[in-house]
């Protein structure tokens, strides 16, 4: 079997696996939440080959933009590459754990991490785009409120595509209303789970919120692609905005700390050197 055919078959096998039950779907979403910049079909293949991946890129991007080199013996993650110019072929990406930074000039991706001090700024920023949420609720519950609102706003646009694809799946034979209910609820829960997972929520605590009662009915590649593409494309701008807000908060906070040190006349003391060393150590983890 050609490698391309093998990877194509792997995608189909993985699609069948992740919709077996809620546990399998949540395992997939946990990986997808870290790789939200990738399209659904590529997320699926990365999950199949490296479910622990956190930040993937082509060898060209690692070399040319990040000045990182792939470790000897590292195995690339194969993805399907279909374009009219070159036909069907494979392309490869490598996880950040597969590379090392060149001395002095190498850098790693800046992977944001949400902490308690970020939550107020994040929710305020999201409310500017997605509308007000219940300020009596916890941050995680307000994210779920936003996710549900997004799903309700968009699922009807997706419904005709899903209706066209349901032949051969467990959705076949259902009327439009019931197909719509299944899409809306599964989409809402998928977006919610993705947002909470990416934000570091305790999924042991919040996992019970997501029944995913209908996930097994999206049991064809076509129906799952409608759901998976939508969940990814709708969660992605939310996560990008969260990341931007966290980085802005961190930059502002770091600037304040630097100004405070300068005002105290510590800019050229050993304490400042220690602070600079600490910042350099922290930056090693990020872009």
Regions from the language model: what does each represent?
Residues 277, 282-287:
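Single conserved hydrophobic/aromatic residue that forms the stacking wall/gate
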Residues 1-274, 278-279:
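N-terminal accessory/interface modules of nucleic-acid-binding and processing proteins
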